[in-house]
Structure formats: structure tokens, C-alpha cells
Amino acid sequence: MKKWRFLGIDDSFDDRKCCVVGCVTCGGYVEGFLYTEIDIDGLDATDKLISMVRRSKFREQIKCIFLPGITLGGFNLVDIQRVYRETKIPVVVVMRRKPDMEEFDSAMRNLENYELRRKIVEVAGEIHRIGDIYIQTAGLTPSEAEKLVKASLIKGNMPEPVRISHLVASAIIHGESRGKA
């Protein structure tokens, strides 16, 4: 089976900053890391992710971008459809639990630019259940995404590059890794 390169992205933040780490893997092997910072509860996550991917030496080799949700840095929403359009790399959001959209919408109402944030949530598309995880996709079908998710797993149900990105991001912010991706 051909080994694909995947980019997994996760964040960690405190009251001062939010770091976003990307981990590039091929098979079970870590090939490199990407890094950027975003505003907590801001609206710059999409632009920063696109820029991070575009400047990467791995860009042409990445088969798929994995995210653990459409939010980073609190409520800094990622427009996954735009990330796909501007990088030409499919995006798969992998979640352990289906989000409560009423609760999510209620929390977003407390932030500036509610209508823009709501639009980003809407264009992220339908949430699909695959086994014991939930996914959203940009640039590929749910069944294609399922194959890529399965190819990216080493242990558990979260793509390995997302898990590693989580560990690195939390170590940068907290001095050691914490929690689960």
C-alpha cells in the first residue's frame, strides 16, 4: 500500500497566545512540523492555516489535512471549504463527539461577527458518523475521507498527525503535553 503524507493540525492556548502546530506524517513516521499563531476567539485561523500550508516544503506531497474540529483558539473558526479551495488539499474534520449545534450557536452569539461565524459553520457542511467518530469534509466524499482516516490511525480513533500536533502544541503552551487531541 502506498504511504500517504498527512498534515494534522491542532492548537493550544492560554490567556496570552494560541499556537497552532501542524504535524506531517508518512505512514507512522513524523516527517516535519509547521507552526503559526492565531488570535484567541479571532477570525484569522483560516488565513493563517492557508499561509502555513502554502509556505510548507511538504505542500505538494500532502494528501489530506486533518483537524480535530472547525474551531481553534476558542472560537476562531476554520473555513474548511476555503482551505480546500485555496490549497487544493482535501480537509477532513475528525471529532470524537457530535457537537451540540444549539449550544455552539448560543456561545457564538457572545462574540463579534456572529453572522460571519455562523456562515463559516454552515459552509463546513454536514456532519457524518463513521464508526465511533464524526467527520466533516471539504474536497472529498465521506467514504473517501473514511479511507484516509483509517490510513492515518495508529492507535485509537484520532488521526496520528492530529494527536502528535496536540501533544506538541500543549507542550509549547503549558511546558508539557496535556489532554487528548
Swiss-Prot record:
InterPro entries: Endo_dU
Domain of life: Archaea
Pfam families associated with the record: DUF99
Family: Belongs to the UPF0215 family.
Protein name: UPF0215 protein AF_1433
Species of the source: Archaeoglobus fulgidus (strain ATCC 49558 / DSM 4304 / JCM 9628 / NBRC 100126 / VC-16)
